[in-house]
């Protein structure tokens, strides 16, 4: 039987040389990160001059990178604020009918003639496990409050059988409240312990999508080319014009069927109640996603996003064996369409929950686990490299190699940069010999590092300003001085980057 390499989840699913190759590629990201750190630690003892010179050069690189990213962040912020002011409903109404051309990998193009925004259906899937009514209900209510016609929405509440009676009771309550509010509203239960599945969102939402196809879309004869599928985390609250913005983008870009559509996650649902370190981590993630939207070549799907139903059906839905199903769906499409698939930035936000628990300590533990779970995205690196090797003769090689470098560099820098600057950069002073400590370089290393990092604090100041501008209004019962904390919290950014960024990223790479 021929192996479908595009559906591979890990090396254990392969045999022989394929297993050995994929296993090596799985180890590679962690090997590179740990090797970088260990080599610098060892050289700090044997060759402290080399490490000191490297640290100074790295600090200069970091400073230039901070300035570059600050410019990009400002540009992204301006684009977001512009898109929030746009009347996307009016923009859609003003659009003339367009002809959409879908080109399969094999066969003749299919043309949908004279498509208007009102012809589109939006399939919305909320995968849930053990979330409570108070988490899910605002997400569905946001669909009600949006200005997009609800008779064009198919809403699926995808719950897990293993969630037990609690989630089933929540789902039944929501079904009773909303089953007549949309074109279709269904609760779909994902069975537990299905063979070949990893317990996670990917398997749940893939099951829900297949059932939606079998029980709703196919029986009603809906046109695959006129459906956009959105998978939202259960706490995702859309803004009023999200589906108008999405529809407008779909109807106006080239190759709409070869794009996924990515909003910007803003963790505003409970931002005023969350501890300061959780807020800093949440905004740091938002800022990174904002900057990625400007740098489209680096953008992959993340968390809540939308994509053409046609593409989703063609590739066989989400992987049922991955932790990072949100990004894997993009890389699956990218490899399936041989590089002719991109992520289109929407520059439009959705609101989600900050990681938060009953106590600060529990929040810190859960935040670390969340960051570590996000670090599972590194599993896409061996997937991309392996499929590049297997498809070497039929793919645009430079494009694939560029993507591999971007992904490998991104996960490597996530796990190492902050540790190099915050910890290893000082080791030559402690591990170097007395001879090194008597040199001019040794005396100047702390001063040079301090000056460069002080200048680089422009990024921290900018983060405080933009986060304040994006912040939702202060709740009535929240004291006024809490706003001061929203600014002062950024003092802890360096520590947060290490504790809730680099360390969980490195931790995840150590599990191979």
Q: Would you name each region that the model predicts?
A:
Residues 334-420, 424-440, 497:
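C-terminal catalytic/acceptor-binding lobe
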Residues 75-86, 220, 383-390, 427, ...:
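Structured alpha-helical bundle/scaffold domains in large eukaryotic membrane-trafficking regulators
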Residues 153, 507-512:
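Membrane-interface alpha-helices
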Residues 78-379:
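Internal catalytic domains of large membrane-associated glycosyltransferases
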Residues 1-111, 501-508:
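N-terminal membrane-anchoring/stem segments of glycan-assembly enzymes
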Residues 36-76, 406-509:
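Membrane-embedded multi-pass helical conduit in multi-pass membrane proteins
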């Amino acid at each position: 039987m021929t192996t479908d390499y595009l559906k591979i989840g890990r090396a254990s699913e392969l045999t022989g040389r394929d297993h050995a190759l994929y296993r090596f590629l799985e180890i590679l990201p962690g090997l590179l990160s740990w090797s970088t750190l260990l080599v610098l630690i060892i050289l700090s003892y044997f060759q402290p001059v080399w490490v000191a010179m490297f640290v100074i050069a790295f600090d200069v690189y970091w400073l230039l990178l901070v300035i570059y990213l600050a410019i990009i962040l400002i540009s992204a912020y301006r684009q977001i604020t512009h898109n929030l002011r746009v009347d996307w409903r009016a923009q859609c109404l003003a659009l003339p009918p367009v002809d959409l051309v879908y080109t399969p990998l094999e066969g003749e193009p299919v043309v949908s003639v004279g498509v208007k925004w009102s012809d589109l259906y939006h399939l919305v899937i909320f995968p849930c496990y053990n979330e409570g009514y108070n988490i899910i209900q605002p997400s569905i209510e946001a669909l009600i409050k949006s200005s997009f016609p609800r008779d064009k929405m198919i809403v699926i509440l995808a719950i897990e059988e293993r969630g037990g009676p609690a989630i089933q009771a929540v789902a039944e309550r929501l079904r009773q409240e909303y089953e007549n509010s949309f074109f279709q509203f269904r609760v779909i239960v994902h069975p537990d312990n299905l063979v070949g599945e990893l317990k996670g969102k990917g398997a749940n939402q893939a099951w829900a999508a297949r059932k939606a196809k079998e029980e709703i879309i196919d029986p009603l004869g809906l046109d695959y080319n006129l459906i956009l599928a959105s998978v939202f985390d259960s706490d995702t609250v859309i803004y009023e014009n999200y589906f108008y913005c999405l529809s407008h983008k779909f109807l106006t870009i080239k190759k709409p069927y070869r794009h996924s559509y990515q909003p910007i996650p803003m963790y505003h649902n409970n931002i005023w109640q969350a501890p300061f370190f959780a807020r800093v981590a949440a905004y740091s993630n938002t800022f990174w996603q904002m900057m990625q939207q400007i740098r489209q070549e680096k953008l992959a799907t993340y968390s809540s996003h939308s994509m053409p139903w046609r593409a989703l059906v063609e590739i066989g839905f989400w992987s049922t064996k991955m932790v990072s199903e949100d990004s894997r769906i993009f890389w699956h499409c990218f490899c399936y369409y041989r590089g002719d698939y991109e992520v289109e930035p929407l520059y439009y936000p959705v609101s989600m929950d900050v990681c938060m628990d009953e106590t600060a300590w529990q929040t810190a533990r859960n935040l670390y686990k969340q960051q570590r779970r996000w670090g599972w995205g590194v599993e896409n690196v061996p997937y991309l490299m392996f499929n590049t090797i297997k498809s070497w003769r039929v793919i645009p090689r430079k494009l694939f190699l560029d993507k591999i470098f971007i992904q490998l560099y991104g996960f490597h820098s996530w796990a190492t940069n902050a540790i190099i600057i915050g910890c290893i950069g000082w080791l030559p002073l402690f591990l170097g010999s007395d001879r090194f400590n008597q040199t001019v370089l040794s005396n100047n290393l702390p001063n040079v590092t301090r000056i460069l990092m002080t200048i680089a604090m422009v990024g921290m100041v900018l983060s405080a300003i933009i986060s304040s501008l994006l912040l939702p209004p202060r709740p009535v019962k929240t004291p006024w001085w809490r706003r001061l904390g929203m600014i002062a919290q950024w003092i802890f950014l360096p520590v947060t980057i290490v504790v809730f960024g680099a360390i969980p990223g490195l931790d995840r790479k150590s599990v191979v």
